[in-house]
Regions:
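Short, solvent-exposed loop/linker segments at the N-terminal edge
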Residues: 45-51
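Surface-exposed binding patches on compact interaction domains or structured appendages
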Residues: 59-87
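Extracellular/luminal low-complexity segments enriched in Ser/Thr/Pro
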Residues: 85-100
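A short beta-strand micro-motif common to beta-rich folds, especially ectodomain repeats
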Residues: 97-109
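Propeptide-to-catalytic entry region of secreted or membrane-anchored zinc metalloproteases
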Residues: 118-226, 386-393, 397-416
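Active-site-proximal segment of zinc-dependent metalloprotease catalytic domains
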Residues: 213-307
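The catalytic-center signature of Zn2+-dependent metalloproteases
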Residues: 274-372
Length: 416
């Protein structure tokens, strides 16, 4: 009898224990499980200015995506699963400023992670090499004063490069010009840098042409963001006008004094002729190279270093002494009459503060050595190269979708 009671007692406690164990086991199965963790091997990348490719390992128990790329920072894949390697390629930074991109890795579930890419700025200025095309307009193909020999054009750019890379004062603007080798469709040019075009007239007004919105005139110009266009024809304006040029545009987020806002032109074409116009009467002269270098200065954002009359004007550069051009020309005539056209005094100017200096600046007119730029002019040219939407080469630009909507389409300024 005692044995029977003990057996029943053991059975009772066995049932209780099993119930407790089952309850504990069931609780573990019902409890929410933590989401698998996303692991990124590198959260901060610091590529060098020359550009670099970084290898990042992403670990996750499931699928994930990576986004936030820019035109200069790109992963080799946008999605993956489980453990995978992503190659993040960072292009060369040609600008002096540090730039930052933040990539976001999003898991299928759980918290996302970030990869900050912080690239150092360039240690020296990027060398801009700008292709130049001369559009030679002619009515009579046999007339050598209209359809000019290509040898005249080949000699112009070396003079320009000497001025822009190695001026009299040793200042290097970091820009070179070369004869374009291919047209916009990628076809090799029979004559490098020369595009010969039968035209409706042997001469025309340079001012009317360079401000024209006529479809035929605009179609003549190759894409300004890829070429420097120089259109060569005989001007109907009076003698003494060798060339004129459009001025570049600036940007709203980094404006430059004297230039118009061209944000809209990052996303749409310019609706007028945009070029340098060169008078055929002057392009065959010995000083034509310096004339082109002067007009390229306008094309890259520089103004004249003088005032046209008594009213003080500015070129927005503090290191270029200003002078009264009209008063100088009167004095020059007196010097020529008394001492002849070779007098060294013709190269002297009297600034608006009374200082006397020798004219060497590329943005002056005769009589001048025209063989140097100043540090402030250098800053303006670099600004235009790095920001202007209608200049060849890489620019620092915002997203076109953000800057084109609602902006006006201003015409270009014209300089001679």
């Amino acid at each position: 009898m005692k044995t029977y009671k003990n057996s029943r007692l053991l059975w009772f406690w066995g049932v209780v224990c099993c119930g407790i164990l089952n309850a504990c086991s069931g609780g573990k199965e019902d409890a929410p499980q933590p989401a698998p963790a996303l692991v990124v091997s590198e959260s901060v990348l610091q590529p060098v200015a020359e550009g670099q490719t970084h290898r990042v390992i992403i670990q996750f128990d499931g699928e994930w995506t990576i986004g936030g790329e820019t035109d200069w920072c790109k992963p080799n894949k946008k999605r993956g699963s489980h453990t995978d390697t992503v190659l993040i390629t960072v292009a060369e930074n040609i600008f002096r400023e540090v730039r930052i991109c933040e990539l976001t890795v999003k898991p299928q579930t759980g918290e996302q992670s970030h990869i900050q890419v912080k690239q150092e700025g360039a240690r020296k200025d990027h060398l801009y090499r700008l292709p130049v095309v001369f559009h030679v307009l002619y009515e009579n193909e046999q007339d050598i004063n209209q359809n000019i020999n290509g040898a005249f054009f080949e000699s112009l750019l070396p003079d320009c490069n000497l001025a822009y890379r190695q001026g009299h004062n040793g200042l290097d603007l970091g820009v070179e010009f070369y004869m374009a080798t291919h047209d916009p469709e990628g076809r090799q040019l029979a004559e490098p840098g020369i595009h010969r075009v039968p035209w409706r007239a042997s001469s025309m007004s340079c001012y009317e042409f360079i401000q024209s919105s006529d479809a035929g005139d605009v179609a003549l110009i190759w894409k300004p963001s890829e070429y420097v266009n120089v259109v060569v024809f005989r001007f109907t304006e009076g003698s003494g006008l060798s060339a004129i040029s459009t001025m570049p545009f600036t940007v709203s987020w980094d404006p430059l004094s004297g230039l118009r806002n061209g944000d809209a032109y990052f996303g749409r074409a310019f609706g007028e002729v945009y070029c340098i116009a060169f008078n055929t009467q002057y392009i065959i002269r010995p000083e034509a190279g310096k004339t082109l270098a002067h007009e390229l200065g306008h094309y890259l954002g520089l103004f004249h270093v003088f005032s046209d009359a008594d009213e003080l004007q500015t070129d927005y550069c503090g290191d270029t002494p200003n002078y009264n051009r009209a008063a100088y020309m009167q004095e020059a005539q007196r010097i020529i009459a008394a001492e002849g056209p070779d007098s060294p005094r013709l190269y002297e100017r009297t600034g608006d503060k009374g200082e006397v200096f020798v004219s060497r600046n590329m943005m002056d007119y005769e009589y001048t050595y025209q063989d140097e730029f100043t540090p402030d002019q250098y800053k303006r040219v670099r600004h235009v190269l790095e920001n202007s939407p209608l200049i060849p080469g890489p620019e620092k630009m915002a997203d076109p979708k953000e800057v084109t909507s609602g902006y006006p389409l201003p015409p270009a300024l014209i300089a001679r």
